[in-house]
Every structure is written in structure tokens, then in C-alpha cells.
Amino acid sequence: VGDLHLGGGGLGGVLLTALSPRVTLLVGAGLYLTAAVGARFGLSARPQRASGRPSVAQTWRNNAVLWSSVPRRYVFLALWVPNGLIVGCESLFVSLSPRHAGTLFACAAFGMLLGDIATGRFMPASWRRVLGAPLRLLLAVPYLVFAFHPALPVAALAVMLASIGYAASLLLQERLMALTPNELSGQALGLQSSGTLTMQGVGAVVAGVLAQCFSPSAAMTVMAVASVLVTVSLARGLRPERVESPIETVPVLAPAS
């Protein structure tokens, strides 16, 4: 999903070089509508696993249970905040370099693809236990180079290297599942996804405000520093010894859709 997000961003950057922003937005809206129609008529109905009637109140109760565990809380924050801050950096590619934004988005997508393949397919379990923190730092540290207004090759390399760090999310999701009872695993992933998308939006807004006040390169540097600080502050709670057994819960009713 992340690869497609960034790939779409790269395509948008390419379209901006050939079309007006208005036409590019219309093309994006048309593709979104096509995807919605495909999902509506192309996906088959599946029975829900949870019992009971969907309820917003039950959704919030389940979320409260998920949030009540301190180790799980650290994992959620590590999945949401550093990622969202770096997406704020990516949201400034067009304003940073309208001519080369497509290249930067493409490099970001390529880096994410490399990281996901290497981590998901080839990384042994022993490495997964020790490379989580370095990957989380890799997500942000390369963006510090934008403080020096790098040339395009250096900027593209920095973006590609940083995007490899998105693979840390795979390791954090494994950690989340190890800390979550089976009956809440689906809602845990849903909460993780919702929080991630929310923080990505927040990161883009904050980065945009900073870019308006200063410059895109300065805003990207600030967002990268903030991501590093958040990652370092969460490191203690993400140590392997903090893993605990999933809590016991009462039978879970279906969350609201």
C-alpha cells in the first residue's frame, strides 16, 4: 500500500510537469472514482468474524483495551508519529522542486520497495530483533541533508535511503500482533492504519505551515529532527524485554464498520 501511495505521488509529480494542477487533480479524482467502483463491484462479501451487532461504543471500548497496554501504546506511537512526520517531508517535494518532484517521489517509492522486500522476504529473525531501531532512525536521518540545499542526485539518494526505513513498520506490526489477543488483531490493525493516516495528514499540514513561514527545505529539516527525537524518546519502551503476553479479554462484539 505504501509503495502504491508513493508511486501515485510520483505519477502526480510527472503529470504536474505536463498538465495543469487543476487537470492533474481531476485525473486523480477520476482514478479514485474508478477504484471505488472496482471495489464496490469487484470484491465479494465475506462474513464477519466477530459476533454481535456493530456498535460505535464497542469500537471505542475495544480501542480503549488496545490502548491500555503500555507496550502496545509505545508500538502504536512508533507506527504513527515518526512516519507521519516524514510524510510531511514528502508532501513538500513539489514546492521544494516542482521540476524534479516526480523524480523524488519515484526514488521514495523505490526505496520503500527495497526496504519492504529486504525486510519482509530476506531478513532473518535474529536481525529483526536488532534492526528495528536503526530502521526507524534511517527513516528520518537522511532528510537532514536538506538543510544544506543538496543537488538533485544527493537529494534523490537521501530520499531513497530514508524510504528504506519505512520497513520498520513491518517489524512494528509484527510486534503489535505479538502483543494483541487474536480476537482484537483485526481492530488493532485497523486502529494502526487509522492512526497512521491521521498522522500523515497532520504531518503534511504541519510541514506546509512551516514551509509557508520559512522554506520547504527548512520545514523538511525540522520535521526530520522531530521524527528523530520522537524515535529516540520511544526507544526505551520498544526494547525487546518490554514485550508482554497478550491480555485476556472478554468476548469481543463487532466494531462499527
Where are these regions (language model features)?
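C-terminal transmembrane bundle of multi-pass solute transporters/carriers
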Residues: 25, 29-32, 96-257
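Residue-level signature of transmembrane alpha-helical cores of multipass secondary-active transporters
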Residues: 5-6, 10-14, 78-83, 105, ...
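Short, hydrophobic secondary-structure boundary micro-motifs
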Residues: 41-42, 49-50, 74-77, 94-95, ...
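Juxtamembrane intracellular "pre-TM" segments in multi-pass secondary transporters
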Residues: 45-77, 252-255
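A general structural signal for well-ordered alpha-helical segments in protein cores
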Residues: 59-60, 77, 93-94, 141, ...
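A single, central transmembrane helix in multi-pass transporters
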Residues: 7, 19-26, 64-118, 216-217
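Helix-loop-helix hairpin linking two adjacent transmembrane segments in secondary transporters
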Residues: 2-40
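Glycine/proline-centered helix-kink
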Residues: 2-14, 91, 197-208
